[in-house]
Amino acid sequence: MRLSNRPFVLQINVSPRGGLPKKAVETVKVTKMGLEGDYNTFRMTKLSGDPTSAVLVIPRETISEFARAGYKLVPGSMGENFTLEGVQYDELSIGRRMLLGKKDQGPIIKIERVCDPCDELLVYGKSFPKDAYGKRGMYASVEREGRVEKGAPVEFLS
């Protein structure tokens, strides 16, 4: 259950074999290596499973901006694991920590770096990877594992 006017998890997205778009699920366990049932080809092949790239988050508003510019995007299209509502992109600064869900059960993630656009985004148009540069989302590590569900509150801890 979410509280009004508070940030929350709008959608949880996974892709068991990689690729875009990721598909929505209602609930998920978040581990140090990412979301159960999700496979990130780039992280596993190019980054050797780097845990600082365990989770990808993006605000819904960023996806909506691209949609208003004519790109056919919906939550999950950018490859993000968590689409957040009520959060601005500039709030996802490096080092920022967030609790997703209940204080005693929800995962705690830490923003680590910008996710650079990859060639998989070409499915949305030739110029899209360039247009998405700096706005693809933010990679995060998992400080505390836990379970989170769609609609869960997002609390900034730092």
Predicted feature descriptions by range:
Residues 1-158:
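Metal-cofactor-dependent catalytic cores
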